[in-house]
């Protein structure tokens, strides 16, 4: 059987003319009186700006005042509930610095010394805070930070300062 060819009729499509007017669509209009009464003034008075000099920013929660023991327990509990491994690090200098070279390197303050091993299997936030107290006793003039490490994705998920040495200029107290 021979193939048959069917003639198709060409349909003409109008060229694109741009966006059409929305005048035909229903529009809900608000009265000007109601929008004039809306104000964000209460929030604006409460907002604060981080000073550009005198207070260094550290980690995730650096904009807050120093965390109390209860606040630290809540943060570590969240870390553990998220299935992250707690890890403690400490450093005499709590911020990034470049002393010997202009390019970044291992010794520019990004990598802190790990306290013991990561706390695999830790299920209690008080265990982590007990280790923070041990670091503070051993190195009273060092910064201590808590890290939450996701060992499945091999990434650091959270990091915050748990202790700043007394008299540090970066805490905003001096």
Swiss-Prot record:
It comes from the Eukaryota. Keywords: Calvin cycle, Carbon dioxide fixation, Chloroplast, Photorespiration, Photosynthesis, Plastid, Transit peptide. Its main location: plastid. GO terms for biological process: photorespiration; reductive pentose-phosphate cycle. The keyword NAD does not apply. Signal peptide: none annotated. The basic functional RuBisCO is composed of a large chain homodimer in a 'head-to-tail' conformation. In form I RuBisCO this homodimer is arranged in a barrel-like tetramer with the small subunits forming a tetrameric 'cap' on each end of the 'barrel'. RuBisCO catalyzes two reactions: the carboxylation of D-ribulose 1,5-bisphosphate, the primary event in carbon dioxide fixation, as well as the oxidative fragmentation of the pentose substrate. Both reactions occur simultaneously and in competition at the same active site. Although the small subunit is not catalytic it is essential for maximal activity. This is Ribulose bisphosphate carboxylase small subunit, chloroplastic.
